[in-house]
């Protein structure tokens, strides 16, 4: 994927360079836990970009309109709305604290002038309406302009209220709250292509909700055994098919993916398809089961493929072939020899996400040291890029990074022993149409775009 010029990636079959566009967030060395970004999501048009953090806040950025005087501005986003989505809670029955951290954000397709999104923490899902107001009503009969009631005996004439222009105000209001349906922590939400329902998944169950109904949901998957000592796997991610409203998939900690069809039965305890790659017995180790756990699953925009991310690799599966993936891309194979120390510092349990580009020809996922990886599915080339303040000059090209595993190290390479495992790219998003990407690095949001000469 990296041509002679450097960090290339497909754009209609041509290589191009990625360049820096923006970085959001403070530069402080001591980052507050609440400021760490926990999810990143473009809306369907790509004009809005939402982030959620561990402090329960949602920040929405709006894309700058491109014009002739600023041809490079299509990768620039400015703050549109900020609101507190979730607050910390306490479950008195179980004596458990419920974090405010936003686990996932999912946009609904836009139906009118307002935008809607779902956000969830470990237990509660909320539907938010994001709307603009640039007019206000004046001239009420019973109230003054400051809201005080007028003396009815002093009202001598009937007034017709009029709308007057005001400064643009963006309001975020909670329209629905979906609660008390999950015993375990919610790890996924996914909006159905019927635009009326969505699913939510925790470790052992998947529920189907209607967007208009908050007091009940349908349990469509339940893998909880009668005896919890017999539990061998948990659900790690779930997603609806982008076009077939009856089909969804869910992945497990054993590295398997099950495709279910809701037309077959109300409770999808029997899958329609079962995707699993046979394990090579010669490479089995103590860590095999941990690193095979799938942390993310994403359908391609076309609906023909799905992508799964485990600890060391990204795999692309054809929905018509269950026996093995059609592509396997190694993300950071050089860490295989470091699994023991990664187990000791708990990094081996990090949950990396993955995403497709708009045409499904390239995929992106994160790594350590603020590195992120891109893979060209057509040419099978790949590139490692870095989200760092050092390369954050306007329109500065990103230079490909290489990790050295041997003894001799070139000047432009970094040794595997000097990687910073506290700097990790877990959450990334790719614009649905353009070559604009958003990369979350701790409390910073980096935005990159393809370079225009």
From Swiss-Prot:
SMART domains (UniProt xref): WD40
Chief location category: cytoplasm
Alphabetical GO biological process terms: cell division; exit from mitosis; mitotic cell cycle; regulation of chromosome segregation
Record's keyword annotation contains Iron: no
Keywords: Cell cycle, Cell division, Cytoplasm, Mitosis, Phosphoprotein, Repeat, WD repeat
GO molecular function per UniProt: enzyme-substrate adaptor activity; protein phosphatase regulator activity
Modified positions (Phosphothreonine) in chain numbering: 308
Localization terms from the record: Cytoplasm
Ranges of the WD repeats in the UniProt entry: 32-71, 97-138, 181-219, 230-270, 289-327, 344-385, 420-452
Modified residues (Phosphotyrosine): 305
Residues found modified as Phosphoserine: 285
Any one cellular-component term (Gene Ontology): protein phosphatase type 2A complex
Subunit structure: PP2A consists of a common heterodimeric core enzyme, composed of a 36 kDa catalytic subunit (subunit C) and a 65 kDa constant regulatory subunit (PR65 or subunit A), that associates with a variety of regulatory subunits. Proteins that associate with the core dimer include three families of regulatory subunits B (the R2/B/PR55/B55, R3/B''/PR72/PR130/PR59 and R5/B'/B56 families), the 48 kDa variable regulatory subunit, viral proteins, and cell signaling molecules.
Family indicated by similarity: Belongs to the phosphatase 2A regulatory subunit B family.
Alphabetical list of PANTHER family matching this protein: PROTEIN PHOSPHATASE PP2A REGULATORY SUBUNIT B
Function: Substrate-recognition subunit of protein phosphatase 2A (PP2A) that plays a key role in cell cycle by controlling mitosis entry and exit. Involved in chromosome clustering during late mitosis by mediating dephosphorylation of MKI67. The activity of PP2A complexes containing PPP2R2D (PR55-delta) fluctuate during the cell cycle: the activity is high in interphase and low in mitosis.
Protein name: Serine/threonine-protein phosphatase 2A 55 kDa regulatory subunit B delta isoform
Gene name of this polypeptide: PPP2R2D
């Amino acid at each position: 994927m990296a041509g002679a010029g450097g960090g290339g990636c497909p754009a209609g079959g041509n290589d191009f360079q990625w360049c820096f566009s923006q970085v959001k967030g403070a530069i402080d060395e001591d980052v507050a836990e609440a400021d760490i970004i926990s999810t990143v999501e473009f809306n369907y048009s790509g004009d809005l970009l939402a982030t959620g953090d561990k402090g329960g806040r949602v920040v929405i950025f709006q894309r700058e309109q491109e014009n002739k005087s600023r041809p490079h501005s299509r990768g620039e986003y400015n703050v549109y709305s900020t609101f507190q989505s979730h607050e910390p809670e306490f479950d008195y029955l179980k004596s458990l604290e419920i974090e405010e951290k936003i686990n996932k954000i999912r946009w609904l397709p836009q139906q009118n002038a307002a935008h809607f999104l779902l956000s969830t923490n470990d237990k509660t899902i909320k539907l938010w309406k994001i709307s603009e107001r640039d007019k206000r009503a004046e001239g009420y009969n019973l109230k003054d302009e400051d809201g005080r009631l007028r003396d009815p005996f002093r009202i001598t004439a009937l007034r017709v209220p009029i709308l007057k222009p005001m400064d643009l105000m963006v309001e975020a209001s909670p329209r629905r709250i979906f609660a008390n349906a999950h015993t375990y922590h919610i790890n996924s939400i996914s909006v159905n292509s019927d635009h009326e329902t969505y699913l939510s998944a925790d470790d052992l169950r998947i529920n189907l909700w209607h967007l208009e109904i908050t007091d009940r949901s349908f349990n469509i998957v339940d893998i909880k055994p009668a005896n919890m000592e017999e539990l061998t796997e948990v659900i790690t991610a779930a997603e609806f098919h982008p076009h077939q409203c009856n089909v969804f998939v869910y992945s497990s900690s054993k590295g398997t993916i099950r495709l279910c069809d809701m037309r077959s039965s109300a409770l999808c305890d029997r899958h329609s398809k079962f995707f699993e790659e046979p394990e090579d017995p010669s490479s089995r180790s103590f860590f095999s089961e941990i690193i095979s756990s799938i942390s993310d699953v994403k359908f391609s925009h076309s609906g023909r493929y799905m992508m799964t991310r485990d600890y060391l690799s990204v795999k692309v599966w054809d929905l018509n072939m269950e026996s093995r993936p059609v592509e396997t891309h190694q993300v950071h194979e050089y860490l295989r020899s470091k699994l023991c120390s990664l187990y000791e510092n708990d990094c081996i349990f990090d949950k990396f996400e993955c995403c497709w580009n708009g045409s499904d020809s390239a995929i992106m996922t994160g790594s350590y040291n603020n590195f992120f990886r891109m893979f060209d599915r057509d040419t099978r080339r790949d590139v490692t890029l870095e989200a760092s303040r050092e390369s954050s000059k306007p329109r500065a090209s990103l230079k490909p990074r290489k990790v050295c595993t041997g003894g001799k190290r070139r000047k432009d390479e970094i040794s595997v022993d000097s990687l910073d495992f506290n700097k990790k790219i877990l959450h990334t998003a790719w614009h649905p149409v353009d070559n604009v990407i958003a990369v979350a690095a701790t409390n910073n949001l980096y935005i990159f775009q393809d370079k225009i000469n």
